[in-house]
Swiss-Prot record:
GO terms for molecular function: 2 iron, 2 sulfur cluster binding; 4 iron, 4 sulfur cluster binding; biotin synthase activity; iron ion binding. This is Biotin synthase. It comes from Pseudomonas syringae pv. syringae (strain B728a). Residues 44-262 form the Radical SAM core domain. PROSITE patterns: RADICAL_SAM (PS51918).
Length: 352
């Protein structure tokens, strides 16, 4: 067994080391990743989250992959910030069918002073339901970060998207250093970090390695690392980007698992395009978190009942959330997920 499979937490990965992980034989890489995974997680448990878009469209950022950018005509109807009560109703529905974490996303460059009180009420309300809370609101200043932490926010999502070298080819309205600063504020405020990136934007292997190096070499590893496959949306500059080789995507998940042994690696956007065999490989490679429901912000996500049927076929069960380890409660969640047949409970932020 190589030194890398011992799952020692490191923050000094080099490009040469990570490149070597990527290019080794596929079976060797997956064996190594699965070995690391089993050292820290139950290999047959997957964390389940629900994501709600609380403010959709008209974002001033120019991210070339994003249908919510106001710079591109994608046909997405913009919406104002959802009312707090509506958000809490959706959180209650998500909890009722088994989600343990509720993530709220807003298409902002950064939250405004007038919106922050409503955002904080959302956090407090969802937290009061006994769910883990997560938000993605764009860039934060230190005061906003501390306010979110005080309100009870558990996780803050702020993706790095790609390597520092390729970043300028995708986004010009926010710097890489600004993203890193937001992550530093989040960590200093005592919240957990959710940060990852996207494959399929024209990046090189070294860019993929570079993204993971940035994340793994942070002072503390992100607790959650979402790995997204580009969802090509008409009207965005990347609508005709070349498809990602499925094996290359699985390699990305496996290397993320090896570099960040204790982090949840999330199989995130793009799952709609993955067949069941590819998703099963993703779980074997160390992915142990998914978004559950019909929409991932504004792009399609596999239907909830299909997810649970696949879980059943693979012998996978949903992971209990923090503070939700009671066996009776967990059994009820698992049964509700298996029996769930309708996805009508989930709010489609793009169709309101």
């Amino acid at each position: 067994m190589s030194a890398s499979t011992t799952a020692t937490l490191r923050h000094d990965w080099t490009l040469a080391e990570v490149r070597a992980l990527f290019v080794q034989p596929f079976n060797d890489l997956l064996f190594q990743a699965q070995t690391v995974h089993r050292a820290h997680f139950d290999a047959n448990r997957v964390q389940v989250s629900t994501l709600l878009s609380i403010k959709t469209g008209a974002c001033p950022e120019d991210c070339k992959y994003c249908p919510q950018s106001g710079h591109y005509n994608t046909g997405l109807e913009k919406e104002k910030l959802l009312e707090v009560q509506k958000v809490l109703e959706e959180a209650a529905r998500a909890k009722a069918i088994g989600s343990t974490r509720f993530c709220m996303g807003a298409a902002w460059k950064h939250p405004s002073a007038k919106d922050m009180p409503y955002v904080l009420e959302m956090v407090k309300g969802v937290k009061a339901m006994g769910m883990e809370t997560c938000m993605t609101l764009g860039r934060l200043d230190q005061e906003q970060t501390e306010a979110l932490a005080t309100a009870g926010l558990d996780y803050y999502n702020h993706n790095l998207d790609t390597s520092p070298e390729f970043y300028g080819s995708i986004i010009t309205t926010r710097t890489y250093s600004e993203r890193l600063q937001t992550l530093a504020y989040v960590r200093d405020a005592g919240m957990k970090i959710c940060s990852g990136g996207i494959l399929g934007m024209g990046e090189s292997l070294d860019d993929r390695a570079g993204l993971l190096i940035q994340l793994a070499n942070l002072p503390e590893h992100p607790e959650s690392v979402p790995i997204n496959m580009l969802v090509k949306v008409a009207g965005t500059p990347l609508e005709n980007a070349e498809d990602v080789d499925p094996f290359d995507f699985i390699r990305m998940l496996a290397v993320a698992r090896i570099l960040m042994p204790k982090s949840h690696v999330r199989l995130s956007a793009g799952r709609e395009a993955m067949n069941e065999q590819m998703q099963a490989l993703a779980f074997f490679a160390g992915a142990n978190s998914i978004f559950y429901g019909d929409k991932l912000l504004t792009t399609a996500n596999p239907q909830a009942d299909k997810d649970m049927l696949l879980f059943s076929r693979l012998g996978i069960k949903p992971e209990a959330g923090e503070g939700h380890a009671d066996e009776v409660h967990q059994a009820a969640i698992e049964q509700a997920l298996v029996e769930q047949q309708s996805s009508s409970m989930f709010y489609d932020a793009a169709s309101a």
